[in-house]
């Protein structure tokens, strides 16, 4: 291994190399997201995982041809125009109503219980040119369909509709007919039907993250001294310093009509149970620390909570400084859609605010981000951007004040319309990642986290592990809670807490997994024992590093809720540096972990950052990644590894 002087002799990092690392980020992040669809459980050994990876790679090589599968080249039946379905009052009225109900029901199922519906516009964008009488008739038919589907609606925006409180039309559009955009949301039968969207809140220290969440949840304004953020803090020193140091959780509920669920008493904060029972959609915020001292905690929160969106907070008087850039880079590396909120505009001089906006726009348009910034200034911008936010190239930007309340209504409306983002496999084997542990009096050990795949019921027998030796313990799920409300079942994509029977809290930790102990296909036969690994091979991209990286290099590696020091034991070339994309073999320093091919990894050491994806579990030292490397470079000082996985004896 080369000395530090030799590495600098090869040349320190130049500005051009740093830009190369930033430019490669977007393409590699897209590649990682595609490869995650090939994720396979690591239960059949490294050879099967390698074969799965190879097959997935060969399929991905022709991914550009997949569009042919989505084209309907057959002679399709001509579609009936929506205007005819809305206004047909003849003999085919019942058939038109049935077709329209089927269209709305399909959209509700696709949107996990909510959808947007346009009246006055066809699916291809053509105007229906509805008169006032036709508008009233269309709404009457929609109302009957909503009652039949057990759903409610909210009129988000109208154009050219008389006496509408949300009309955004103008004099030049009066001849173009009545137009309206509706939010349709199904009434949940129980808590299990509630729509859940997870948002990670990041930004530099003193950007106003906790204060904004306090204002949104309580429904009251701040006093400029942090009055509303106190309820979000978990520790005494956080209240005294005013700075978050742990991963905080808060929820915001919306009912079926799109109204925020708040207490009737001004300033009173509702409990999670009250919000969960009255809400049809719940926004789960993960409040993360902004100080550089707590970067590991912040990265852990970003990966373990599996957020659907990322909310970046920027103080108007400070700009995008300090850890804000680090957090933005991590969110981009994880391919999470980003929205930006500029706070403290009430105390910021106009010229400083303009400098912040210019800096933010420049960074978002840079090759590493490739975002399209859209400034939300009115209700129409808010609704149109929220409906198109499924495109990750869009980055909405809000300018708010927690003291005066300016533009906070736009933020609430945006969160209400925000579409459900993320794909989860309910039919796959159950897998639950633990991101926190508790000891509850008279209940016992409780673990919380996110269900990665599958379905689990209260009373199921599960395996919890691995421990330091790679062993899994058998236990039973005593009860399940979501948002502190007891539920009988939990499925993929939902965050939940499990009360475990006969397990001590000291025996569970963050980063463990919970797996079913029996197979659904054959309940009487025990499932194959989970295999855990200390070594794995990943394809990585070096985002930033001052010099070169060789074998024996160590860094903190994050895989979901797992945070552990890893050492590089093999590389497919002599060394790698900023902007390089390489195949690397890692080895956990402390203990083996449960890994799957397709898991996304993030490793860092100070300002050094790298992104990657697991390509193979296990590593065979007799088959080095770089056969041409000198023998002493691959074996001297590196602990020789074996190809065998550590199999638990549950």
Question: Where are the model-predicted features located?
Answer:
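P-loop NTPase switch module centered on the Walker A-proximal segment
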Residues: 198-293, 305-310
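C-terminal effector modules of nucleic-acid-centric enzymes and ribosome-associated factors
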Residues: 194, 198-201, 349, 504-650
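Polybasic/polar functional segments that serve as interface/processing modules
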Residues: 1-192
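Active-site glycine-centered loops adjacent to acidic/histidine catalytic or metal-binding residues
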Residues: 343, 401, 606
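Conserved catalytic-core segments of large NTP-driven translation/proteostasis enzymes
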Residues: 198-206, 210, 214-218, 362-546
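Conserved Switch II/interswitch segment of TRAFAC-class P-loop GTPases
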Residues: 281-284, 288-295, 305-326, 335-355
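Phosphate-binding P-loop
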Residues: 189-196, 277
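Alpha-helical scaffold elements adjacent to nucleotide-binding pockets in ATP/GTP-utilizing enzyme cores
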Residues: 141, 212-216, 248-250, 297, ...
